Amino acid sequence: AALREGDLGDGPIRTKDAKEVGNKFGELGMDKVLMRKIYAINATTVLVNDTTGIQNLHETRELIIEAFNDVCKKGPIADEPLTGVLVRLVDAKLHEDAIHRGPAQTIPAVRNAIKGALLRANSVLFEPIQKIRIDAPSEWAGGITRQLITRRGVIEDMPVENDVTCVIGKMPVAESF
């Protein structure tokens, strides 16, 4: 909820702010030590650098964050945005020559690694659900509820006013056509 509301920020996290942001995550029940290594937040998705002793990784920080943001905008399934994911960078092998650590090499490698990890973790595509309200004569209420249930809908309330029944519920968008 704190991520959704933007209480923890959004975008790259400066190194000097990482400890404070990590402490905020700790207050929310997450591993404070891990979250102090935070690189970036993109909506409800977080990138953490959990590596140790990798030389020159700091030189590619911005490129890693850029690749992370690309994946957050277009995830591995149907190019849909990611939501509620913690991405941990646990290892990296960087070329010793700086010329081979540029955007053309780093961004696709990181992007593909994150997408591959997400696919291996059995990512799911959330189904869009719509709220519905149907006002109809009371004698039609049975048919309306039957249709709603056969279309995988959920009835939340059915207030009756005079001879009109109002059916309020939710149902998958794909089932409404």
Predicted feature locations:
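Accessory interaction regions appended to the cores of large information-processing enzymes
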Residues: 1-177
